[in-house]
Amino acid sequence: MVQPYRHEPLTDFTVEANREAFLAALKKVESELGRDYPLVIGGERVMTEDKIISINPANKTEVVGRVAKANKELAERAMKTADEAFRTWSRTSPEARADILFRAAAIVRRRKHEFSAWLVKEAGKPWREADADTAEAIDFMEYYGRQMLKLKDGIPVESRPGETNRFFYIPLGVGVVISPWNFPFAIMAGTTVASLVTGNTVLLKPASATPVVAYKFVEVLEEAGLPAGVLNYIPGSGAEVGDYLVDHPRTRFISFTGSRDVGIRIYERAAKVHPGQIWLKRVIAEMGGKDAIVVDKEADLELAAQSIVASAFGFSGQKCSACSRAIIVEDVYDQVLSRVVELTKQLNVGDPAEQATFMGPVIDQNAYNKIMEYIEIGKQEGRLMTGGEGDDAKGFFIQPTVFADVDPNARIMQEEIFGPVVAFAKARDFDHALEIANNTEYGLTGAVISRNRANLEKARHEFHVGNLYFNRGCTGAIVGYQPFGGFNMSGTDSKAGGPDYLILHMQAKTVSEMF
């Protein structure tokens, strides 16, 4: 019997045995660095001459892995394989599909620290961030497996005398999963298994910065019993392989997590009907945010400062949910700003393989350059309070950066930076603070720190974000507890880890029988 869902607990690294186990996992992963990884098409390993070189962002000279790189021809082969596999996989019982997710979750749980160690090396995640990423991957498998079991018989509808009506869900077809580098295990696994458990076959194109952990997950699903051809692993260029698959007439849906610009490009391309295409493609997209924490004059100011720092600088601000705007009512602006600067100066920036590190590197040279450009813009648009320096000699390290007195319409208050940068804006009162908070094209996460119930209730209705938090930070949604996804340019309003997410990967069918 399947037990009720509970989220995977995070590891307590104050326990010596846990620390030792994690260090052992790091040593194991270090001994496996630099290996070659193939594509997986129909269960067959396919090596290519062209490779994606995955490096450790904390140490540019350390190669994590060399991964085969798909081209259009191999993508077409994978599409034909997935299309063929759909015929049998779509008819596999929901119970059997869910069981594969449960077995995969158990395998990852046994190897939890190993997967987290890969995240330390490939994504530059500090211990706690890596551990949370792995736990979330487990949660997605456990939660979506259970959700499929709830949906397997459909939803009851009314029937008249002499009539039986059934309303149930069937799979869509071949899905293209384009996963991000910032949650290279959790989001990659979640979007993949949501597509699989609903009876679809998948072409997985992971982010080029983090393809190794995705390959490791493909191995887990194979071990869990996933049939060959149901999941095909085809890392490659977005401009070549990504566009080709988005345009392909046999692609039924695209599940994308990434930037606003790429998401818009995919949405536009998917809307075009190509020769031989007999459906309108579905796009499930999560595209980022410009998230704010609002603090009113009746807030717990220490909680406010702690929440801003944790939300702005966890994983170097490389979360779509990260706090990049702090909007403070003028009565308490100076106190909150001063405390945030004080706390930020205490943060330990360094090698994520060291337990004491709070903040590691940003993901790559392009990200480093972009963030440093925004810091220069910030120096013109606001008052630099701390940080602002970068060092890319060995890895891609940027100091946590705080800007004060920024105009709500400034670029660093409007554009997604995706790095360790937070901008402070002063509001006249709470209404003005909400007005500033809603003044972007995004609508992903937000938080309000306040003891005033009327203000919280006002924010509940007027703060237009998909995930709104009261008296806590704006990051760290838990699967099944805080379904995650935003409004406006933050995506297609889907809610990962929520009760209606799987339905996006299926279509409803009604069967009516007279007797």
Swiss-Prot record:
Active site, per annotation: E286, C320
GO molecular function: 1-pyrroline-5-carboxylate dehydrogenase activity
InterPro entries in alphabetical order: Ald_DH/histidinol_DH, Ald_DH_C, Ald_DH_CS_CYS, Ald_DH_CS_GLU, Ald_DH_N, Aldehyde_DH_dom, Proline_metab_enzyme, RocA
Entry-linked CDD domains: ALDH_PutA-P5CDH-RocA (cd07124)
Keyword vocabulary terms for this entry: NAD, Oxidoreductase
Catalytic activity: L-glutamate 5-semialdehyde + NAD(+) + H2O = L-glutamate + NADH + 2 H(+)
Listed GO biological process terms: glutamate biosynthetic process; proline catabolic process to glutamate
GO CC entries: cytoplasmic side of plasma membrane
TM helices/strands, residue ranges: none
EC assignment: 1.2.1.88
Domain of life the protein comes from: Bacteria
Pathway the protein acts in: Amino-acid degradation; L-proline degradation into L-glutamate; L-glutamate from L-proline: step 2/2
PANTHER family (UniProt xref): DELTA-1-PYRROLINE-5-CARBOXYLATE DEHYDROGENASE 1, ISOFORM A-RELATED, DELTA-1-PYRROLINE-5-CARBOXYLATE DEHYDROGENASE 2, ISOFORM A-RELATED
Similarity field: Belongs to the aldehyde dehydrogenase family. RocA subfamily.
Name the UniProt record assigns to this protein: 1-pyrroline-5-carboxylate dehydrogenase
Species whose genome carries this gene: Geobacillus kaustophilus (strain HTA426)
